[in-house]
Amino acid sequence: MKALSEIGTEQHWLERKRACLTNVYTDMTALIADSKAPKNVSLAAFRPKKIKKLVVAEDEREWKPEWLAQLKQLDMFTNGNSSGPRAPIEKIPYKFKYTFEDEHGRSSTMSIEDWEIGALYRNCIKRAGGDENTAIEKVRKKYETEFLTKKDITLFLGTTLKHHRSRHSNPFTIVGVFYPPRESQQALF
C-alpha cells in the first residue's frame, strides 16, 4: 500500500472533518434501525450527546487459540517480502469501553476496538515499568480527562459480520475515536 496524500490538522482539522463527518448519527435507535435492511449500515460516525465515562474491565491475559492462529498468519502488508508468519503482539489484559448517551438520553456502553487505545496502553505500560495501574490511569487521563474536556469527540462505530447477521439488539462497537480540538466560541464568529 502506498499513501497518495495526507490530510493535515490545520484549521482545527477542517479537511479531516470534511472527509469524516458528512453523515453523522446522534440517535442510537435510528442507527440500529439503519443497520437492518434495506440500508444495512455497518460503519457510521456517531456523535454522543454526552460521554459519561471510560470503563476499564479485566480481560483474558492470553490469546484464545483461534485468535492466536489468525495473528500468526502472513502479514498482508509486506508485499511478499516476509520470511514467514508474523509474531503475535502481546495481548492487552483489559477491555476499554465508553459509556455514553445519545441525543435522547439513551445510554450505551461499547467496547473501544480502536488500535490507538491499544498502542497507548502498550506505550504507557512500557513507560510505567510494567505497572498496570499506572498505565491504566494514563489511558484514563487521555481518554476521559483530556478527550472529554478538550476534544470534540465523534465515535466511529462498526459491526462485525457475526453480530450484524445475528441481529443483536446493538451490533455496534467503537472502531475509532475522532478527536479534533474543541473550538472556542470565538472561533465560530
Residue ranges and their predicted role:
Residues 4-189:
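Nucleic-acid-binding small beta-barrel platforms of the OB/S1 family
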